[in-house]
């Protein structure tokens, strides 16, 4: 029995294994013209299972018994009548004018969707009406303009057509009726019936075979072998091949078989739980319908096809799971709840994984069987069909659909399109099938009545349990439902502020007003038709119909149901608009009434893999030969899918379920460390080796002679010696020792490291178990050594350098050597000296400077050593390699860098920072010199303001002769208090009273390299009473260098009696403020002698005798000088005071 999964999936191509059917519905819509009395119900046909698809047609008929002129007047009025609808509440879509007028001639036919108008008798004239499909969006105005021509126009034919697909006609016609509006109970139509055009708008088979298979159901019943052949052919059909749309060859409608189809290849292995990370997606695509426009016409049966191909890692084990995710806006089936996914099977029918579907997450979870433990390198191919979820997407919109295999996503932008209401005059209606219950044998239909909310009069809605022909005649036996008093019919009223979803599918009716009870007396049943009388309405209504159906004897679902709305216009004409929905299915089964022949015989291939020790390609010629286990063997089917298995402990393998006459390929994976043996080493096909790849055709029997042999690939060594080349000649001498613990690295031809080792105590190293090929050997230079010269002599005695290439060709290679010699070390340094004569040259009398810090930096600027000069000024850095260095001298405190680079490098000064390069020698030429320099800094700034106010009247005659010679070099800090009393007797008598108040404030700030700071504050209070007649001649020569800080208070009283009488009264007030800032730098530093020591110009020291009597003349001059200084000070202070006042 073929895997049916309780789902029907037979097509004219025969039994399809591993298919799941999904139901969808298409529509036929009929818009009917206004007629007078005796209206015929017109229902078009449409089919669809897991999705809805309808065709629309309109009929416009009127018979006028008035005169021709009257008819013309009516026609004229109608032609010029333009109506505008404004509906801001309903998102029901576009209007499309689709009128047609039947031929008046009998037996005439047409093959197009446009019917020709023909004249009728002179007393009868048809009035063309405008049949419309109306699109009304919220707050959008639409104007329907009536045309004088009558044209039948299809609403979008579905875009995918199968060779098995049949078409259903949909026509509308104009009939002549009496002028008085009446209902006719006679469904028959006496007018001649033209042959309708065929419309490609119905359910198609999603299987899309490569070629049409024209075979009848009866033929399948009588010839079961033919059925099996069709199944096998379908399994081998390439999933990606899609047929070109062709003209249908049958008028029997066909149900859409939405399928999931798989093709697989090989096995795997790991722990349980989700193993999405072990699934590799090789291809993913999303296609809408025929893939031309990415428009998902949800009511026209356009499906979304998701194709995915993936491989399953060999680590996957039984019980592990992987996931497939649908987009949240789609569902696997549009009409039923049959969402169980198909099992994944290989071409022989063995199950690889079983799936379960989670409706909440829209995810399939596949659980792997033990198939993945038996086989390897499994490849799978999967095609999933789904449909727009009308609950998730209630209105037209654009979506980005995303599907995923094992978490790897792919996306596609699509536009969702829903059907239009069928409109003629005030009649506007649309319907779809919404749910199929095969267990209860019921079908649910939802009908929108007046979705455009027009003002409709004399409104009646018919629900017919059958298809109708092109003229409204009921056609029994071509699909039906049961419409009677047991049919569930519910009516709901739509409030003005409510919007109907464009999907034409209501999931929650509680939001609408249930007015079913209002139709208890307005509902009638007759001839499998229910009629509801709505009367005059301006609201929209929803009718939900749940009717019964009877399956056919072979289990097919021949279901059809139609509905129409009729109203009268202001002239009393009926306007018709209608839809019909239907489902027709094919049953996918292998049974029937005939006798099924026994299952087709299947065959197997396989045999043996062995180790061919003697490499002769023949089994059993050496006693050491043995079977090889765990060798991977892969079978490729004719369709390109594969499966793999490994040899068992006895070296055997086997593939079963193979079909006669088909060709397969067997490939053996060469085990690591082995090589394939000789092919066809004997004429005995049972004992030879067939090689790594074998192509075999099944010829009515098993083939267990497909063997292959391998032999171990020989291994080789590589290495030799690392030695100390003491004479640096690059040749291994007998007395030169090996170097131990040298690291050696081996790389393959791709640069990958395949081994590391170190030399032993004798300097030897070796790499083993190597195959033929090219290798690279790298030696790491030992610490304290330098590589010697390379390639100087014979290959086995020279040095190959730090990196060398070794080739193994069917033999060991022990010639890769490397030599090193000990790296010499060097020293650097010299001398730091006191360059007393500042000439930058080391003189024999100049001494070294001790404790000078010297820093050594390497080429990177890193400090590698510091030291200080010894007591002789010497310094040194040892154990240095050849290279670049920098020496930095730190200048001693108080000393100055001497001039640099004045003479030979070993006798001059190199400066504070010196760059030096050592190349295989010491360098003791890095010197530096410093000297001590006198430095004087003096900056003097003096600001003096003296104000002296003096009024003096003096009459004095004085004669004094004084000669004073003084040379003084003095740096002193003294505090002197002097009291002098002088008595002089002369011819002059002077009486003088002088009162002087002097206040002198001097502030001096001096910065000097002579370390001298002077702050002088002098306050002098002098009261002098002098009576003198004096004649003084004084010659004073004084050379004084003095820096002093003194505070002097002098009180002098002098009494002199002379012949002159002078009365003097002097009052002096002096205020002196002096601010001095001195900074001087003479570039020289002179030691400062003790402040108490003074020298004269001639360097003759002098001191005042304790008696104070030595050099009286000088003393007198000093006294008078002091008095005059005091007087001058008083005068200055008094002037300043006067100025201040």
From Swiss-Prot:
The modification Pentaglycyl murein peptidoglycan amidated threonine is found at residue 1107. Residues 903-913, 930-1080 have a biased composition (Acidic residues). It is found in: Secreted, Cell wall. A motif (LPXTG sorting signal) lies at residues 1104-1108. Residues 53-601 are annotated as: Ligand binding A region. It holds the Pfam family SdrD_B. The keyword Repeat applies. Its main location: secreted. Belongs to the serine-aspartate repeat-containing protein (SDr) family. This is Serine-aspartate repeat-containing protein E.
């Amino acid at each position: 029995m073929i895997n049916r999964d309780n789902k029907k999936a037979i097509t004219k191509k025969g039994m399809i294994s591993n298919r799941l059917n999904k139901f969808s519905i298409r529509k036929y819509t009929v818009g009917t013209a206004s007629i007078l009395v005796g209206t015929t119900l017109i229902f078009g046909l449409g089919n669809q299972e897991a999705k809805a698809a309808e065709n629309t047609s309109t009929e416009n008929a009127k018979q006028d018994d008035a005169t021709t002129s009257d008819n013309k007047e009516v026609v004229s009025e109608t032609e010029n009548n333009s109506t505008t609808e404004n509906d801001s509440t309903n998102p029901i879509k576009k209007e499309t004018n689709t009128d047609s007028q039947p031929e008046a001639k009998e037996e005439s036919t047409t093959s197009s969707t446009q019917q020709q108008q023909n004249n009728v008798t002179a007393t009868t004239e048809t009035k063309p009406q405008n049949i419309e499909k109306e699109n009304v969006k919220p707050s959008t105005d639409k104007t329907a303009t009536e045309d004088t021509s009558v044209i039948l126009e299809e609403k979008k034919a579905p875009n995918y057509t199968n060779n098995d697909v049949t078409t259903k006609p949909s026509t509308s016609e104009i009939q002549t009726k009496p002028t008085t509006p009446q209902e006719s109970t006679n469904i028959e139509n006496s007018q001649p019936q033209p042959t309708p055009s065929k419309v490609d708008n119905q359910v198609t088979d999603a299987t899309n075979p490569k070629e049409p298979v024209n075979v009848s159901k009866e033929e399948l019943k009588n010839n079961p072998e033919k059925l099996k052949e069709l199944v096998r052919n379908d399994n081998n059909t390439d999933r990606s091949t899609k047929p070109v749309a062709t003209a249908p060859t049958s008028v029997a409608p066909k149900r859409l078989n939405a399928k999931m189809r798989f093709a697989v290849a090989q096995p795997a292995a790991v722990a349980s739980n989700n193993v999405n990370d072990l699934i590799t997606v090789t291809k993913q695509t999303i296609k809408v319908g025929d893939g031309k426009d990415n428009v998902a016409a949800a009511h026209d049966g356009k499906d979304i096809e998701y194709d995915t191909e993936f491989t399953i890692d060999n680590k996957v084990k039984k019980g592990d799971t992987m996931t497939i995710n649908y987009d949240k806006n789609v569902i696997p089936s549009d009409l039923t709840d049959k969402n169980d996914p198909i099992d994944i099977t290989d071409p022989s029918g063995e199950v690889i994984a079983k799936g379960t579907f989670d409706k909440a997450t829209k995810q399939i979870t596949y659980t792997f069987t033990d198939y993945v433990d038996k086989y390897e390198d499994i490849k799978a191919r999967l095609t999933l069909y789904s449909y727009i979820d009308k609950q998730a997407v209630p209105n037209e919109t654009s979506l980005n659909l995303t599907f995923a295999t094992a978490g790897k996503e792919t996306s596609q932008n699509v536009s969702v399109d829903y059907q239009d209401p069928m409109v003629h005059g005030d009649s506007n209606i649309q319907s779809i099938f919404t749910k199929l219950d095969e267990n209860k044998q019921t079908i649910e239909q939802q009908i929108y009545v007046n979705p455009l909310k027009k003002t409709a009069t004399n409104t009646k809605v018919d629900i017919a349990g059958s298809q109708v022909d092109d003229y409204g005649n009921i056609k029994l036996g071509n699909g039906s439902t049961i419409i009677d008093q047991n049919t569930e019919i519910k009516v709901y009223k739509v409030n003005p502020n409510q919007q109907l979803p464009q999907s034409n599918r209501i999931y929650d009716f509680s939001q609408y007003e249930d007015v079913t009870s209002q139709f208890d007396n307005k509902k009638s049943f007759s001839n499998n038709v229910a009629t509801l009388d709505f009367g005059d309405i301006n609201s929209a209504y929803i009718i939900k119909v749940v009717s019964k159906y009877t399956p056919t004897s072979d289990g097919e679902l021949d279901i059809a149901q139609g509905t129409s709305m009729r109203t009268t216009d202001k002239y009393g004409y009926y306007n018709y608009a209608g839809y019909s929905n239907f489902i027709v299915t094919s049953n996918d089964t292998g049974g029937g009434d005939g006798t099924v022949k026994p299952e087709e015989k299947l065959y197997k291939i396989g045999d043996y893999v062995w180790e061919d020790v003697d490499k002769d390609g023949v089994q059993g010629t050496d006693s050491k030969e043995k079977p090889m286990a765990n060798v991977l063997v892969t079978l490729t089917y004719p369709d390109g899918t594969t499966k793999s298995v490994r040899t068992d402990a006895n070296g055997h393998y086997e593939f079963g379920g193979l079909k006669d006459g088909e060709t397969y390929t067997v490939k053996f994976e060469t085990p690591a460390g082995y090589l394939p043996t000789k092919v066809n080493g004997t004429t005995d096909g049972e004992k030879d080796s067939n090689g790594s790849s074998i192509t075999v055709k099944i010829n009515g029997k098993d083939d267990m002679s497909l063997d292959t042999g391998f032999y171990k690939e020989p291994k080789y060594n590589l290495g030799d010696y690392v030695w100390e080349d003491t004479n640096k000649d690059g040749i291994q001498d007998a007395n030169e020792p090996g170097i131990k613990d040298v690291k050696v690295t081996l790389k393959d031809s791709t640069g990958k490291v395949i081994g590391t080792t170190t030399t032993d105590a004798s300097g030897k190293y070796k790499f083993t178990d190597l195959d033929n090929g090219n290798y690279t050997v790298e030696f790491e230079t030992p610490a304290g050594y330098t590589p010697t010269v390379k390639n100087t002599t014979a290959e086995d005695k020279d040095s190959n350098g730090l990196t060398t290439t070794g080739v193994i060709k069917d033999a060991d290679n022990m010639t890769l050597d490397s030599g090193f010699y000990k790296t010499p070390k060097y020293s650097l340094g010299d001398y730091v000296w006191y360059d007393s004569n500042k000439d930058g040259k080391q003189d024999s009398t100049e001494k070294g400077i001790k404790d000078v810090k010297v820093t050594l930096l390497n080429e990177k600027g890193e400090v590698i050593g510091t030291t200080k000069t010894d007591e002789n000024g010497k310094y040194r850095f040892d154990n240095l390699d050849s290279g670049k260095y920098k020496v930095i001298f730190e200048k001693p405190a108080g000393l100055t860098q001497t001039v640099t680079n004045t003479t030979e490098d070993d006798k001059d000064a190199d400066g504070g920072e010196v760059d030096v390069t050592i190349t295989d020698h010491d360098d003791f030429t890095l010197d530096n010199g410093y000297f001590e320099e006198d430095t004087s800094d003096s900056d003097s700034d003096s600001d003096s303001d003296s104000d002296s106010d003096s009024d003096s009247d003096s009459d004095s005659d004085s004669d004094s002769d004084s000669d004073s010679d003084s040379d003084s070099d003095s740096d002193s800090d003294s505090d002197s208090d002097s009291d002098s009393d002088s008595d002089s007797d002369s011819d002059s008598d002077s009486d003088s009273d002088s009162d002087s108040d002097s206040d002198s404030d001097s502030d001096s700030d001096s910065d000097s390299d002579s370390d001298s700071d002077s702050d002088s504050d002098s306050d002098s209070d002098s009261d002098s009473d002098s009576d003198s007649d004096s004649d003084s001649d004084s010659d004073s020569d004084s050379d004084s260098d003095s820096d002093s800080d003194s505070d002097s208070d002098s009180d002098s009283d002098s009494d002199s009696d002379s012949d002159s009488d002078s009365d003097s009264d002097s009052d002096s007030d002096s205020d002196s403020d002096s601010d001095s800032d001195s900074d001087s730098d003479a570039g020289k530093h002179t030691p400062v002698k003790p402040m108490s020591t003074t020298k004269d110009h001639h360097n003759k020291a002098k001191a005042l005798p304790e008696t104070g009597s030595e050099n009286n003349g000088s003393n007198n001059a000093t006294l008078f000088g002091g008095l005059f200084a005091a007087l001058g000070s008083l005068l200055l202070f008094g002037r300043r005071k006067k100025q201040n006042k």
